[in-house]
Structures are given as C-alpha cells and as structure tokens.
C-alpha cells in the first residue's frame, strides 16, 4: 500500500475473456494471457483465471481516499478452497468467500496471510468466525495483534511446504522489504509466484508506501526470491497486473 499513491488500473474487467499484457523494460517479456474474469455486481470484487485451479482475487479498497485494487490468489484444491490473503476488511472478505464458494461449490478451508497490512489481513475476524485456518509467520501474528487484528496462527517458518489436497504450496520468507514480515507463496506445480507487496507491478513508478519498509534490505530479499525460484512462469504482485519474473527485475530497478 501507499502513502504517495499511484493510481493503479484494476487488473480485471467485465465478465468474459480478457487479455492482460505485462511489459517490463528490464526484460524482453511482453505477455498476453487470455483468461476468464468474474465480477460481483458492484465491481468491487473480481476473480481472474490463471489456469484450471488457480485464480487471482482482486478487491477494491480505499487508501488515503483513493480506490486501490489489491490482489491475492484462490486455489481450487481437491480438499477445498485456499486463499492467499484475505481482503481490506471483513465485509469484502465475507463477500469474496461467499462468491468463490458459490462459484466452485466448495468451502474455503485455509488462508495464507503474506503480511500484516490491512489489504492482506483486514478480514481476520471473518476468517475466525467461519472457522477458516489463517496461516502466517509468528512475526505476522505478532504484528497483527499489535495493530488490533485477530491473530493468525503464526505457524509458518522461513520455508514451509504445505499440501492442500492435490495442491502443493511453499511459503518463503526472503527477508525484509515492503515490511519486515513479508512472505511470498510459490505454487511449484504451476510455477506461479504470489509476490504480495514485496513485488511491484509493471506500471509502478515508485515503491509506494514505505512507512514500514526496509528499503536498504529490499533488493537482497528480491534477489533471494530470484535465486530460489529460477523457473517462474507467472508473478502475481500485491497490486496491479500479473506478469512474469520481469516484475522482480522491475522492482530491483525501482530500488536503485
């Protein structure tokens, strides 16, 4: 999220088939992927298909008086639905859960929280009320409590390998960056990285909200992600359009 906020374009559109294009100067990558996008009636929540079992969820929240879209993932597993990140608040999170449960005819069983800012953790009360397991690092749980949120489980280590039905998931803490607790989520079967707010979109012109950032350590953390995941297919940033590993390189450029 931002203090000096860029106006970000919503990375979804009306129900139908829509292309998204990612162009990053750091690499040659210019990618167009056709995918289904489903929106709620008010346009505040959208889910965008990356493949059969992985969708991006995007909610429009407000920061410093401006509408800002925030991304997470919906994982359609054989044992239920798993979200990467909740949403800005309980109302949006509740509607998101109801939307995906209706779409996939499965319950949301688990959520992975990537850091303790409102756009990730704002729906913790709703998750607790619904008996949904909210996984996080111990540091994120500590910061959540400090910031007045319900605490997630705090069960994730620096590297944690999880399996939800037929879906393998790895969480990785690469070091400090956007926040001291930011993690990324890796889907090895699909080579998809959920970069959260550690990774900037192609349209980002600056680092955005650095109130809780560790700018001097951010580059090292991005490099740690690049070293660990050399075969990235798609990258989902915390805000803005989906791209490829070039988004990591673009983030490094912004940090120079």
UniProtKB/Swiss-Prot annotation:
Entry GO MF terms: beta-lactamase activity; zinc ion binding
Chain positions recorded as substrate binding sites: 200, 209
GO biological process: antibiotic catabolic process; response to antibiotic
Binding site residues for Zn(2+) 2: 119, 197, 239
Main location: periplasm
Subcellular locations according to the entry: Periplasm
Gene3D superfamilies linked to this entry: Ribonuclease Z/Hydroxyacylglutathione hydrolase-like (3.60.15.10)
Cellular component GO terms held in the UniProt record: periplasmic space
Regulation acting on activity, per entry: Inhibited by chelating agents such as EDTA.
Lineage top rank: taxon: Bacteria
Residues noted as binding Zn(2+) 1 in the record, renumbered to the chain: 115, 117, 178
Cofactor(s) needed: Zn(2+)
Activity as a function of temperature: Thermostable.
Cofactor binding notes: Binds 2 Zn(2+) ions per subunit.
Pfam entry (one): Lactamase_B
Catalytic reaction list: a beta-lactam + H2O = a substituted beta-amino acid
EC number(s) stated in the UniProt entry for this protein: 3.5.2.6
Top-level enzyme category: hydrolase
Record's keyword terms, sorted: Antibiotic resistance, Hydrolase, Metal-binding, Periplasm, Signal, Zinc
Signal peptide positions (record): 1-29
Keyword Signal recorded: yes
Family as reported in the entry's similarity comment: Belongs to the metallo-beta-lactamase superfamily. Class-B beta-lactamase family.
Subunit structure: Monomer.
Function field: Confers resistance to the different beta-lactams antibiotics (penicillin, cephalosporin and carbapenem) via the hydrolysis of the beta-lactam ring. Benzylpenicillin is a better substrate than cephalosporin C and ampicillin.
Family matches, as NCBIfam families: bla_Bc_2 (NF033095), bla_class_B_core (NF012229), bla_subclass_B1 (NF033088)
Name of this protein: Metallo-beta-lactamase type 2
């Amino acid at each position: 999220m931002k203090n000096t906020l860029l106006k970000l374009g919503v990375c979804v559109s009306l129900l139908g088939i829509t292309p998204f294009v990612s162009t990053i100067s750091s690499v040659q990558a210019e990618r167009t992927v056709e995918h289904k996008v489903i929106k709620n009636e008010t346009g505040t929540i959208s889910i965008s298909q990356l493949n059969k079992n992985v969708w991006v969820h995007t909610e429009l929240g407000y920061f410093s008086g401006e509408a800002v879209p925030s991304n997470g993932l919906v994982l359609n597993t054989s044992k239920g639905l798993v979200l990467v990140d909740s949403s800005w608040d309980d109302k949006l999170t509740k509607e998101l859960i109801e939307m995906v449960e209706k779409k996939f005819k499965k319950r949301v069983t688990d959520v992975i929280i990537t850091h303790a800012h409102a756009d990730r953790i704002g729906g913790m009360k709703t998750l607790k009320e619904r008996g949904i397991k909210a996984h996080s690092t111990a540091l994120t749980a500590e910061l959540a409590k400090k910031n007045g949120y319900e605490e997630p489980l705090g069960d994730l280590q620096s590297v944690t390998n999880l399996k939800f039905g037929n879906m393998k998931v790895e969480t990785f803490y690469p070091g400090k960056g956007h926040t001291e607790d930011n993690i990324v989520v890796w889907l090895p079967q699909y080579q998809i990285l959920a970069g959260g707010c550690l990774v900037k979109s192609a349209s980002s012109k600056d680092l955005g909200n650095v109130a809780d950032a560790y700018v001097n350590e951010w580059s090292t953390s991005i490099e740690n992600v690049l070293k660990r995941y050399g075969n990235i297919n798609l990258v989902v940033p915390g805000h803005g359009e989906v791209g490829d590993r070039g988004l990591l390189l673009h983030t490094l450029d912004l940090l120079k």
